[in-house]
Amino acid sequence: MINSKLLFIITHSRGVFFVLNRIKLVSFFGLLLIALLGLDNSVVSFNSNNTVYLEEELNLIWKEQDPAGKEIFVTRMNQRLPEWVNLFKEAASQTDQHWTLLAAISYQESHWDPKAISKTGVRGLMMLTQKTAKEVGITKRTDPKQSVMGGSIYFQSLLERLPESIPRQDKLWMTIAAYNLGFSYLKEARKKTLNANGNANSWNEICNTLILMAKEEDDPSMTTRINEAVGYV
């Protein structure tokens, strides 16, 4: 989970999308997003000199948090990401996300593997369910272009379903969790937080509620899913 104060402002042609604050880096997703921002800001191509420079930057931000995770990410970045960057940028240009956010979600979901499939049946670069694919109008989940565009549209739809009163950054983390877990669980967590006289617009409080929901679950598979979603963000 990420605790916030100012570090990065991601800009988009439509204006500022979200702000990442000065943070204690305890989230792999946070590390991943910052790494991809570094890629966007400092690496214009994927030649060896540029990727070596980025690896040096990663060493500074990753530190001892997850050295194995960093090595896997660097390998995937060199071997897989170049093929899909333009798809992420194309999808980002048609929605309100920055391409690095879409790429970070895709890495967490599939490690940028277009043929990825989970035990629950989600597939593709953005790991969409059949229901979600139908909702966003894609016919082949393992088609990279369809998957990225579908995932981008789905993420934007989740973002827009949340109240405007939620602070922008909290709204972002909630949407990322909902993408992985499902909007119904986020909705239930917000309701439970309100019923406990908490702040349903605070990601930190929603996160704590989700942790309690995981402990109360009778279905071990759902306990795992909720915990994974919390860890995801």
List the predicted regions and their residue ranges:
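Catalytic and substrate-binding regions of cell-wall glycan-acting enzymes that process beta-1,4-linked
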Residues: 52-63, 173-233
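Substrate-binding/active-site groove segments that recognize
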Residues: 115-139, 146-157
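Second-shell loop/turn segments in exported
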Residues: 71-78, 88-91, 113-116, 134-145, ...
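N-terminal export signals and maturation junctions of secreted/periplasmic proteins
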Residues: 20-90, 114
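Intrinsically disordered, low-complexity segments enriched in serine/proline and basic residues
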Residues: 2, 6-8, 12
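Secretory-pathway/luminal and periplasmic proteins that interact with or process carbohydrate-rich
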Residues: 110-119, 158-161, 181-196
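Aromatic (phenylalanine/tyrosine) cluster motif
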Residues: 8, 17-18
